[in-house]
């Protein structure tokens, strides 16, 4: 809904939801929300659907973590079916369906995207997974579309009349967010936003370049 508000108040900005944890959504509700935001924005909406990697998030919704792959497959099938049905009204503006990427970092993600003929959103450190996806798309007769934004591009921008003052006032909160988020990484899991580096100090946050404090243009 935040994307819908942004799109309603702009004319050229593209809103990218990256990413929504698909298995935690009711399929029909998600289809309705995406269709509405797509229409409000005149087709300027991009949604990446992922599984997530934190069991606690599934526990909060009472959803079995080990079922997330099956639930995602069911979700994608339901979304495509609803958006193509004349009985689903109001339908999305973008046809045959809104722009939906499948996001993740494992081979099952590539197989899922190729099977449904959907574009793939990967971390930049997994070129071999992009190649695997392209091979699968070629076998299935789909045109592969893959984006691999580097961690730095997945940052946050804060607007303040005095950017230096913003760092002074909000720096401890920037640091808390960065340390918690990067702390979720481990083993084969890498935070899409903060990568695998260690964040210990506010200087580390600034050096990473993924939080920007900027002065709004007049």
Features from the language model and the residues they span:
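N-terminal beta1-alpha1-beta2 module of alpha/beta enzyme domains
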Residues: 1-10, 14
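Active-site mouth loops of central-metabolism enzymes
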Residues: 18-28, 96-104, 157-160, 208-216
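A short, GP-enriched loop/loop-strand-helix hinge that lies immediately N-terminal to
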Residues: 14-18, 47-50
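Internal, glycine-rich beta/alpha segment that forms the wall or movable "lid"
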Residues: 23-116, 121-136, 140-147
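An alpha-helical appendage that flanks or caps ligand/catalytic pockets
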Residues: 61, 65-91, 125-218
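Alpha-helix boundary recognition
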Residues: 7-8, 114, 171, 206
